């Protein structure tokens, strides 16, 4: 807030199932509703300018960021670090999704930001460790998503951090990540 904008950094937004529905059957709808409720609550307190709110996340949080930006106009920019953007590349389940791709193909498709790259209208910073060995978030996830977004004319930047895995450890990498995030926020949110 001291810089003139707000960032929802890795917010917790629960997605639940009701009755016979699995939680991910209505993932996008619940995710957007949760984000809107959070922004509404902070706005009601008088703390924010709704046009100057960004969202950021790491891993599953990055996946949520990409979905929020593709399916809402709530945010001025997004930061997605080491995420999974094409759920068909994790066909035997992920996080709370226990069904395989072949049991719930529409869920995998609907939850994959890659499949909705044409809807991205918000500036997005993708950051990924070149040596990410997390089976769901190999660097391929970010490079392919970046190529799709760029090919469709989206405002996107990809930063690959040398010799970094899923979490970043080198001081240089952390400082560079912070600088990249600051540049995005200064240019598109402030």
Where are these regions (language model features)?
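Serine-hydrolase catalytic core recognition
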Residues: 1-190
């Amino acid at each position: 807030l001291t810089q003139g904008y707000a960032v929802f950094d890795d917010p917790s937004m629960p997605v639940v199932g009701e009755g016979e529905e699995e939680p991910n059957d209505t993932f996008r709808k619940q995710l957007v509703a949760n984000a809107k409720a959070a922004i509404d609550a902070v706005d009601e307190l008088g703390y924010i300018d709704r046009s100057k709110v960004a969202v950021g996340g790491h891993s599953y949080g990055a996946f949520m960021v990409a979905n929020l930006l593709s399916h809402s106009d709530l945010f001025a920019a997004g930061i997605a670090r080491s995420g999974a953007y094409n759920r068909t590349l994790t066909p035997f389940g992920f996080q709370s999704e226990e069904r395989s791709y072949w049991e719930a193909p529409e869920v995998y498709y609907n939850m994959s930001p890659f499949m909705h790259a044409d809807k991205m209208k918000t500036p997005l910073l993708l950051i990924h460790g070149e040596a990410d060995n997390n089976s769901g978030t190999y660097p391929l996830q970010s490079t392919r998503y970046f190529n799709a977004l760029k090919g469709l004319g989206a405002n996107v930047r990809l930063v690959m951090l040398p010799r970094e895995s899923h979490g970043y450890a080198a001081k240089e990498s952390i400082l560079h990540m912070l600088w990249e995030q600051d540049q995005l926020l200064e240019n598109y949110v402030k």
